[in-house]
């Protein structure tokens, strides 16, 4: 059982969200802790000025994990928390410091890319929230995901199938990785220096993709399986009846094939 916190105006459908502190004051988080309900967070501070929302020295996610979430951890140390779609070294450090009661998900795009990839050529298919960050952040995410003793970090795609990604009025936030996420995670692990031809590397990827999440939530592992094969796979647009087509992330970046394929 889990509940998701979205910051006010922080994402689609969150226009009427409450400030994080309100849930500390009104007893909601305390009741969740007492009942064993997990708090999942979209960890960003909103309502910020542009220079504070995304800056080299601080950003919306760092402010949330430095100033907001620690208050909940201090007030309710038994509350189980998942930092969803983590993007910063600051967030990684907090998860590690918090210990076993805190976990985190990481998306394929945040392991593969940085804000430089987004800005160079204005690659709007890489626009998601939280935004891609800097190389030191990607390095921290990669280290956390691929570590041999990792039990707190696990896969979470946050995939968003927008049929109309960019318009004259702005850009829909979210990267579509449905059906190709395991392949992209495998690519990210290899780029992080993990040899997936060896049993140790395979075990690290398997834990991140399939074991750490269920183990952290205390649910049974899936009995279904798939096999990743180092063979290029073509990426195609998906038809959504009555709405149009969805462009998978690699195709939006001009990549018609990805390095790994999947066998069910």
What is the meaning of each model-derived region?
Residues 151-221:
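His/Asp/Glu-enriched, well-ordered alpha-helical/loop segment
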Residues 190-264:
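Active-site microenvironment of metallo-dependent hydrolases
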Residues 106-174, 230-236, 241-264:
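Active-site neighborhoods of metal-dependent hydrolases
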Residues 1:
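Short acidic/polar active-site loop segments enriched in Thr and Asp
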Residues 4, 12-155:
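Histidine/acidic residue-rich metal-binding segments in metalloenzymes
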Residues 13, 49, 134, 160, ...:
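Residue-level detector of solvent-exposed, low-hydrophobicity positions
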Residues 9:
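Glycine/aspartate-rich loop-and-adjacent alpha/beta segment that forms the canonical ThDP
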């Amino acid at each position: 059982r889990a509940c998701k916190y979205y910051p006010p105006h922080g994402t689609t459908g969150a226009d009427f969200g409450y400030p994080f502190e309100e849930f500390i004051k009104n007893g909601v988080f305390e009741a969740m802790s007492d009942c064993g309900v997990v708090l999942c967070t979209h960890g960003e501070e909103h309502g910020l000025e542009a220079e504070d929302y995304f800056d080299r020295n601080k950003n919306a996610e760092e402010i949330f994990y430095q100033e907001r979430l620690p208050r909940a951890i201090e007030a309710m140390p038994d509350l189980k928390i998942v930092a969803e779609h983590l993007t910063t070294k600051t967030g990684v450090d907090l998860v590690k410091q918090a210990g076993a009661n805190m976990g985190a998900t990481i998306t394929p795009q945040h392991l593969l890319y940085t804000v430089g990839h987004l800005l160079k050529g204005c690659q709007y298919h890489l626009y998601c929230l939280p935004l891609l960050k800097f190389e030191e952040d990607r390095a921290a995410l990669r280290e956390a995901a691929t570590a041999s003793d990792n039990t707190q970090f696990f896969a979470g795609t946050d995939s968003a199938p927008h049929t109309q990604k960019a318009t004259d009025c702005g850009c829909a936030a979210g990267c579509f990785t449905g059906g190709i996420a395991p392949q992209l995670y495998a690519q990210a692990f290899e780029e992080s220096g993990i040899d997936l031809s060896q049993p140790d590397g395979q075990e690290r990827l398997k834990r991140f993709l399939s074991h750490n999440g269920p183990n952290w939530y205390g649910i049974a592992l899936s009995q279904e399986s798939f096999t990743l094969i180092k063979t290029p796979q073509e990426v195609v647009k998906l038809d959504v009846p009555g709405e149009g087509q969805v462009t998978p992330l690699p195709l939006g970046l001009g990549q018609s094939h990805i390095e790994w394929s999947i066998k069910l």
